[in-house]
Amino acid sequence: MDDPKIMNIMNGMKSLEDHCQLISDVKDESPMQMFYKDKGVFLTGGTGFFGKIIIEKLLRVTEVGQIYLLIRTKKGKDAFARIEDLFNDPVFAKMKQVNPKYRCQITIISGDCSLPGLGISADERETIMENVNIVLHSAATVRFDEKLKMAIAINVHGTKEIIKLAKEIVNLKALVHVSTAFAHCNMRHIQERFYSGTMSGENAFKLSECLDEHTLNTLTPTIIKGYPNTYTFTKVLAENVVQQSAQNLPVTIFRPGIVITTYREPVTGWIDNMYGPCGVIVGIGSGVLRVFTGDMDNKAHIVPVDMCVNALLASAWDIARNKYETPPIYNYVPDAENMVTWRRYMEDGFEYGCDIPMRKSIWYPRFTIVPHMWQYHILCFLYHTLPALVMDAIMVIIGKKPRMMKIYRKIHKLSNVLKYFSSNEFRFDNDNVRKLTEKLDDRDKRLFAFDMRDLDWTNLFRVSLYGLRLYVVKDDPSNIPESIKRYERLKVLHYTTLAVFYALAAWALYALLKLFL
């Protein structure tokens, strides 16, 4: 791989991963390490993207006593089977080298945030009450189109059950509720404070209990009016539950922006999903997504997951040390001193994606961004629907299963989800996050770095593209030279096809003019 563009990416990754060496060079225990040492941490959402990094960080950098993981049965796999899958993820490789006996620090709690009492047995509940010191509640249904009844059960009632459990814990030091920076997206300026919603969390739960699912689905647009989806609506309700029910607890609310790949640790560019803007980049890189809508000059409030987790862990440390009149709220978003636009994200993603193209791309990557929906629908038909129908027809003729229209339905669904956030401009206050940064000593600033003012966006976008290719698309780095050759062939095919199309269009126009003139 002697290509200078590829070497730039690899060198950028090397410089970022050197940060992990700096972490290992910290010899004396830092204040945050001492805080987590021998503590019992109860974590919800541990099998998710965000939760994996929380677990990895605690096991690799701190001497945490025990992590109690609330895990539900899913797709026929119980909690114990799912934990095996969890630790097979490559994101834990470095942690396993540093802490080979990590399994001794993991206790599985079978349960479900949507169930009464979290579905936890009496014995396990007693274990939590006696041994847990820190509660990190990150579990949520993040599906924007989730049915309202289920979204309320998990995001709202689940939060109420967590608070109820936290009140029973004998030696609780900190409770962190993970919300989202876009919970209050019905407003354009979002401060680090509580806001009142259209109804209380308690009333929303009562409403979902007394109405059947069909009726609730019918009424959903009216109930969530002012919010783009059930996810943001129920996140507002969950914050209301914290405000009303957890005032006497050492509690804080952590609101991350749009979370993307890791920046530096434990490995650069790691991700395990295609949600949000990362899915858009994969769609463009694979040659499938060719048109997108939004105001590309709006700010992109994206944050790397490793820095986000560091800030969350620091918020728990801070609430355990200080008493506040009202629960502190942290908007963890890019700092005003160091922000990028959606245009920068999309264009850089496209540029770096062309440097290391995907081996399984179905066409030469090209994309167009339009601000108006009428433009978007016209171009979607021309660039997405029409080619998909042709390709599916060919697949049927040769006896294979058509799949392009199914793919495009998913893509259009993703585009519809993101257009609200890319078309509207949001401004966030982050004074509490800045103050939290200043409370860290030099050791913790290295061990738990989360100052977004220090982020190098160019490096982040480069390693993100590499990570998406490696961890999501499953393209091995060794096939990059082969992929570049294929990319060049697709480029020739693309422009040849365009030339033929325009030639035929010109001929047809000439024939029509000749016929009528």
Curated annotation (Swiss-Prot):
One of its GO terms (biological process) is lumen formation, open tracheal system. GO terms for molecular function: alcohol-forming long-chain fatty acyl-CoA reductase activity; alcohol-forming very long-chain fatty acyl-CoA reductase activity. It is found in: Apical cell membrane. InterPro entries: FAR, FAR_C, Far_NAD-bd, NAD(P)-bd_dom_sf. GO terms for cellular component: apical part of cell; apical plasma membrane; cytoplasm; peroxisome. Disruption phenotype: Tracheal morphogenesis in embryos is grossly normal. The tracheal tubes fail to fill with gas during the final stages of maturation, and instead remain full of fluid. The hydrophobic outer cuticle layer of the trachea appears to be disrupted and forms membranous structures extending into the tracheal lumen. It holds the Pfam family NAD_binding_4. CDD domains: FAR-N_SDR_e, FAR_C. Gene3D superfamilies: NAD(P)-binding Rossmann-like Domain. Keywords: Cell membrane, Lipid biosynthesis, Lipid metabolism, Membrane, NADP, Oxidoreductase, Transmembrane, Transmembrane helix. It catalyses: a long-chain fatty acyl-CoA + 2 NADPH + 2 H(+) = a long-chain primary fatty alcohol + 2 NADP(+) + CoA. It is a multi-pass membrane protein. Its main location: membrane. Its EC number is 1.2.1.84. The chain crosses the membrane at residues 378-398, 492-512. Catalyzes the reduction of saturated fatty acyl-CoA to fatty alcohols. The preferred substrates are C24:0 and C26:0. Necessary for the final stages of tracheal maturation, to facilitate the transition from water-filled to gas-filled tubes. May help to maintain the integrity of the outer hydrophobic envelope of the trachea. Belongs to the fatty acyl-CoA reductase family. This is Fatty acyl-CoA reductase wat.
